[in-house]
């Protein structure tokens, strides 16, 4: 058991394949030596996951109860899950469609820092309906702090005590939003909408808990496009649209080419395509060549 853990939630066939991207990069860069993975898995996906990932050191598969109403944040509401996670110093809460980079293998988080990714849910909607304006007003109405943090993505790294605090507040705010803030209908992105409520809740919780000095934005959930990877990029998010080199909708539709990279790509999009299209052994060998 390592001192740190990456947590993900697996709930369908697509997330099973997406999990392979996270898993392959975890193995490729020997991140398994410093970070465990715990995959909280719905019963509908447990057979496929255990078939592919059983008896792997530092990887735990936790089957969730069939009656449990699950999401990426409700798993932190279970006493059993909390007890399991309390054994770790740091937690990286992320989604399956995450690609870890070489830089993550040497990353050592600070105890007093909260690391978050970049999100798109705060894009401007209709005139007078800016998402961040509504979030700020709601925080003030709920007597929560607002530090002006915006475009916060779903990725979160922090000391376990901080992660529990943030996810608990996110869970509470999300339930409140769904109950009281959509009286005019469910809405459609990029305007105020129920599908993004969990993202609004996360940004609102971060604004209340994280001061400007404690928050580090941008090293997680980097763009998956033609941008060159830098030493600051710890992970890449597989965005579902508008990406030049790796669009995950096109990947699942079989519309992306199989290139067969002979060396490590320098752009994030090519890196993601290489990971998705290669097996673990190929990637480990490439990492060995890169590091030597």
Regions of interest found by a model, annotated:
Residues 189-194, 208-292:
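C-terminal catalytic/acceptor-binding lobe
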Residues 144-240:
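Catalytic core and acceptor-binding pocket of nucleotide-sugar-dependent glycosyltransferases
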Residues 14-15, 46-49, 99-103, 124-125, ...:
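Short catalytic/ligand-binding loop motif for oxyanion handling, primarily in non-cytosolic enzymes
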Residues 98-142:
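Conserved donor-nucleotide/metal-binding helix-loop-beta segment in metal-dependent transferases, i.e.
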Residues 62-94, 98-102, 106, 113, ...:
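A conserved donor-nucleotide-binding helix/loop in the catalytic core
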Residues 38-39, 91-95, 115-117, 213-218:
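A structural signal for short, well-ordered beta-strand segments and their strand-loop junctions
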Residues 1-70, 80-88:
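N-terminal anchoring/stem segment of glycosyltransferases
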Residues 75-78, 102, 127-129, 174-177:
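A structure-centric feature marking long, well-folded core domains of fungal metabolic enzymes
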């Amino acid at each position: 058991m390592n001192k740190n853990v990456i947590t993900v939630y697996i709930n369908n066939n697509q997330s099973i394949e997406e999990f392979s991207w996270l898993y392959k990069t975890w193995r490729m860069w020997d991140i398994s030596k410093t970070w465990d993975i715990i995959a909280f898995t719905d019963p509908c996906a447990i057979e496929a996951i255990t078939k592919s990932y059983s008896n792997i050191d530092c990887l735990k598969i936790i089957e969730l109860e069939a009656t449990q109403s699950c999401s990426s944040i409700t798993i932190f509401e279970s006493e059993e899950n909390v007890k399991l996670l309390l054994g770790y110093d740091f937690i990286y809460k992320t989604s399956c469609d995450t690609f870890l980079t070489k830089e993550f293998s040497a990353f050592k988080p600070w105890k007093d820092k909260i690391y978050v990714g970049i999100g798109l849910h705060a894009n401007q909607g209709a005139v007078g309906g800016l998402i961040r304006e509504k979030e700020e007003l709601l925080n003030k109405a709920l007597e929560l702090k607002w530090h002006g943090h915006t475009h916060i993505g779903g990725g979160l790294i922090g000391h376990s005590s901080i992660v529990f605090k943030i996810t608990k507040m996110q869970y509470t705010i999300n339930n409140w939003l769904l109950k009281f803030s959509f009286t005019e209908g469910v809405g459609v992105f990029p305007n105020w909408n129920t599908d993004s409520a969990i993202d609004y809740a996360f940004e609102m919780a971060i604004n209340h808990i994280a001061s400007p000095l404690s928050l580090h934005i941008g090293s997680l959930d980097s763009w998956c496009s033609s941008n060159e990877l830098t030493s600051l990029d710890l992970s890449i998010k597989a965005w579902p649209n508008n990406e030049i080199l790796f669009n995950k909708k096109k990947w699942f539709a079989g519309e992306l080419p199989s290139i067969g990279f002979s060396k490590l790509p320098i752009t994030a999009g090519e890196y993601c395509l290489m990971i998705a299209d290669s097996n673990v052994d190929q990637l480990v060998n490439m990492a060995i060549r890169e590091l030597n």
